[in-house]
UniProtKB/Swiss-Prot annotation:
The gene is IDH2. This is Isocitrate dehydrogenase [NAD] regulatory subunit 2, mitochondrial. One of its GO terms (biological process) is tricarboxylic acid cycle. PANTHER family: DECARBOXYLATING DEHYDROGENASES-ISOCITRATE, ISOPROPYLMALATE, TARTRATE, ISOCITRATE DEHYDROGENASE [NAD] REGULATORY SUBUNIT 2, MITOCHONDRIAL. Ubiquitous. Predominantly expressed in roots, stems and leaves. Residues 1-25 form a transit peptide. Heterooligomer of catalytic and regulatory subunits.
Amino acid sequence: MSRQSFSLLKNLRSIASGSKIQTRSVTYMPRPGDGKPRPVTLIPGDGVGPLVTNAVQQVMEAMHAPVYFEPFEVHGDMKSLPEGLLESIKKNKVCLKGGLKTPVGGGVSSLNVNLRKELDLFASLVNCFNLPGLASRHENVDIVVIRENTEGEYAGLEHEVVPGVVESLKVITKFCSERIAKYAFEYAYLNNRKKVTAVHKANIMKLADGLFLESCQEVAKKYPSIAYNEIIVDNCCMQLVARPEQFDVMVTPNLYGNLVANTAAGIAGGTGVMPGGNVGAEYAVFEQGASAGNVGKDTTEEQKNANPVALLLSSAMMLRHLQFPSFADRLETAVKRVIAEGNCRTEDLGGNSTTQEVVDAVIANLD
């Protein structure tokens, strides 16, 4: 072996052992003026919503994030969205939202659904993944559920045909099916995801879910580098419980996505730690990813021990959406450190910490 080759081999061994590894920061080159603080519409919401949105505000202030909030009082039992709310979101383009209670039965429509329709937030995204240090039913879970947000069973087209007989219409359109499929594949492409799975019940609803599947199949042909498969929704739920690691990106019609996202969240670590958001062509609303329990119990509200992790991670997603990647990374890293250390957790994660104690721990772990 020549002296030059020996020297090269020695250097390679040194690098492999870590003695000469030099870290290089990832550079984000902003445009002039990108550091200007951005307004964000804030909906504290119901139940524990004010607790967890306040947690986000405290952390944002501690890290001097270039955002400020415009709060609006909104509650799920209101008959309509309050005046000025939509105008604020349309002006700011971004909203952070706590949970809103949806009354069961009666004549009050869901403000969550109304907000999505008014702003055409056609894609719901929930990221379900294992957090290091947090025990879960399965390992190696990293699933993104992308759900069509504006039609399907949530179209709200119900009426009583005759006394005792109610008809509820499920609406599936080519336009909405294609755009949610395009969004799912685009998301997979931009985030280096390897597979998109379409969830359906086309074996029974042959026309409605058949149209959804047909749209997914057409879009899949335009992304040959991304694997594509299909699964019936009942089998999907069973497979999620048995082998969730097989899933990557899942694209679903409206109702199925709600069920699948909450199931995946429960498997990966609980609804209290899963981030998410709703996005359209112009606007985005970020909130706790999985809807189950997002307004909390009365005792949780009274004891002030609501889990702020999901909304903090959703806020990191929001910061990336606003093109503040370093702030997003700092926030996400701090939250994950607190979870991994295990000393400060709320009751739903097996601890006895208050919301404020978790906030203080996250702030202490900020770089």
